[in-house]
Amino acid sequence: MSKDTHDDELPSYEDVIKEEERLQSQPPRPPRPAANLAQGHQSRPHQRPSTMPATSSSQTYAHSHSYTPTSSQPRPPPRPQQNPSLPWTYPPRFYCSKCGNTGYKLKNGRSCKSCWRRFAPQNNVVSAPTYYTNYTMPVYTNAWQGNRPLYVQPGDPRLGGVLCGECRGSGRTRFLLDEDICPLCHGVGRIITQPQRY
């Protein structure tokens, strides 16, 4: 008996084929406008338009959402936004196909080394002038007892600046089997931009 009730619930093969043919023979429905979905009309059944004259607010609503596709004129590609975390600005007519002027590759999100090599400012190795004097300075041992220097790895955020795009924070660059200090950040692992003094 359970087999008979189970067979009664399922449609036969012929019924399924007829239903598919019936659905295919019907013309496709036009897509519903997005404005109705945004206002929560999806749960209401389709209503006939009223015969009352339209008010000015409904007329402006109907005209504000009209869309006329123009496939004959392709839009120009949008100019990418300048990444505020980059320590440089791109020239006006320059476009990098790898990163789209964001400084980071579109395909994998890693830094675009060609842009970093070309536009990133190099760290200033000698940031403060050194003055040599002939006299000896007195040494105060009490001042240095509590504060020991803090050693950090290259690329540590405590150094400030932006992570170097050439070495990606390691402070070193590789070429085949050779490893050298990064020419952009000089081994710091970060690009530290300082305001220009004039």
UniProtKB/Swiss-Prot annotation:
Residues 1-86 are annotated as: Disordered. Residues 48-67 have a biased composition (Polar residues). Residues 1-23 have a biased composition (Basic and acidic residues). It is found in: Cytoplasm. InterPro entries: Hua1-like. There is a cross-link at K3, K18 (Glycyl lysine isopeptide (Lys-Gly) (interchain with G-Cter in ubiquitin)). The modification N-acetylserine is found at S2. GO terms for cellular component: cytoplasm. Keywords: Acetylation, Cytoplasm, Isopeptide bond, Ubl conjugation. It comes from the Eukaryota. Belongs to the HUA1 family. May be involved in assembly and disassembly of the actin cytoskeleton. This is Proline-rich protein HUA1. It comes from Saccharomyces cerevisiae (strain ATCC 204508 / S288c) (Baker's yeast). The lineage of its organism: Eukaryota, Fungi, Dikarya, Ascomycota, Saccharomycotina. The gene is HUA1.
